[in-house]
Amino acid sequence: MSKHKLIILRHGEGQWNKENRFCSWVDQKLNNDGLEEARNCGRQLKALNFEFDLVFTSILNRSIHTAWLILEELGQEWVPVESSWRLNERHYGALIGLNREKMALNHGEEQVRLWRRSYNVTPPPIEESHPYFHEIYSDRRYKVCDVPLDQLPRSESLKDVLERLLPYWKERIAPEILKGKSILISAHGNSSRALLKHLEGISDEDIINITLPTGVPILLELDENLRAVGPHQFLGNQEAIQAAIKKVDDQGKVKQGKQ
């Protein structure tokens, strides 16, 4: 029996999403389409009469800005927003900044799919010579995390994402839900997938088939033990959502004529 409702979403589109590049921990802002996606998400939640008590985000701009725009559309700007690196996007290591389609050309579509969607496969780690290494690790936000800078990841599998996310879920988010508070989590594709895997009991093998489009609210109904009652539900125009999911899936494929 459903006792709690939780809204999770992947942030609105950023420029690197549009350019089909691995964004990861690079702090890209929302582009114009992403701004509209976030506002539309807020409008959908308003139409469904959602009222939030607390919002959780990563410490990346695109996650935070999406949450702000949603709250603005809801007229709930006063709702507290808490940010943690533990909700950050998956760290894609040496793949950061690279184009997914070009990677598929060079390494094959299946390898790129494993890097993007599998549970256990970890991309090569980021090195200090990487063009975005210092932009990430010199940023002040990573010097005030709950782990030392030298213990932050240099690359992650989805399994790693879940392992760093779960303590925050159990210690900070879950207790608020159990108090009866209405929670919104504005996160990223892979931190959201990791959380869905945990709450829905999705297998290591099946998680590769879960794809989340940008800027679409996801409803999870949870029981008294915070386990999902039924599968997650995308809120909005289902035909448009399925088209958006296919678009995300196709990012790691080589377009016809280039093979």
UniProtKB/Swiss-Prot annotation:
Residues under site feature: Transition state stabilizer: H188
What are this entry's molecular-function GO terms?
Answer: bisphosphoglycerate mutase activity; hydrolase activity; phosphoglycerate mutase activity
Q: Which Gene3D superfamilies match?
A: Phosphoglycerate mutase-like
Major enzyme class: isomerase
Per its UniProt record, what InterPro entries does this chain match?
His_Pase_superF_clade-1, His_PPase_superfam, PG/BPGM_mutase_AS, Phosphogly_mut1
Q: Which residues form the active site?
A: H11, E89
Catalyses which reaction(s): (2R)-3-phospho-glyceroyl phosphate = (2R)-2,3-bisphosphoglycerate + H(+); (2R)-2-phosphoglycerate = (2R)-3-phosphoglycerate
Q: What is the lineage of its organism?
A: Eukaryota, Metazoa, Chordata, Craniata, Vertebrata
**Role noted for this protein:** Plays a major role in regulating hemoglobin oxygen affinity by controlling the levels of its allosteric effector 2,3-bisphosphoglycerate (2,3-BPG). Also exhibits mutase (EC 5.4.2.11) activity.
Q: Which family does it belong to?
A: Belongs to the phosphoglycerate mutase family. BPG-dependent PGAM subfamily.
Annotated residues that bind substrate are located at 10-17, 23-24, 62, 89-92, 100, 116-117, 189-190
* Modification sites for N-acetylserine: S2
The superkingdom of the source organism is Eukaryota
Q: Which UniProt keywords apply?
A: Acetylation, Glycolysis, Hydrolase, Isomerase, Phosphoprotein
Q: Which residues carry this modification: Phosphothreonine?
A: T122
* Any Gene Ontology biological process: oxygen transport
Which Pfam families does the entry link to? Answer: His_Phos_1 (PF00300)
Q: Which SUPFAM superfamilies match?
A: Phosphoglycerate mutase-like (SSF53254)
**Name recorded for this polypeptide:** Bisphosphoglycerate mutase
Give the UniProt tissue specificity note: Expressed in red blood cells. Expressed in placenta (labyrinthine trophoblasts).
Q: What is its EC number?
A: 5.4.2.4, 5.4.2.11
Q: How is its activity regulated?
A: At alkaline pH BPGM favors the synthase reaction; however, at lower pH the phosphatase reaction is dominant. Inhibited by citrate.
Subunit and partners: Homodimer.
